[in-house]
C-alpha cells in the first residue's frame, strides 16, 4: 500500500506523468513509459534501471 498523498506528488522520472498504483503487484505504473516501478518495504524505487518493462 502507498500513501495517497505520496502517490499524488510522485511522477515518472522519464515522462513526468502521474503514476498509477497496482496493488496486486505492489508497483507504480507509468503507462506512457510502459514501466512498473517497484515498492520495497513501503518505499517507491523510482530508478529506471530498477523498473520492470511492461508489454
Curated annotation (Swiss-Prot):
Family: Belongs to the UPF0434 family.
Short name of any one Pfam family annotated for the protein: Trm112p
Coiled coil (UniProt feature): none
Any one GO cellular component localisation term in the record: cytosol
Protein name: UPF0434 protein ERGA_CDS_01260
InterPro entries in UniProt: Trm112-like
Amino acid at each position: 500500500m502507498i500513501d495517497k498523498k505520496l502517490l499524488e506528488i510522485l511522477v515518472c522520472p522519464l515522462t513526468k506523468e502521474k503514476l498509477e498504483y497496482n496493488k496486486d503487484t505492489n508497483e507504480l505504473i507509468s503507462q506512457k513509459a510502459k514501466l512498473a516501478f517497484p515498492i520495497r518495504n513501503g518505499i517507491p524505487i523510482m530508478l529506471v534501471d530498477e523498473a520492470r518493462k511492461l508489454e
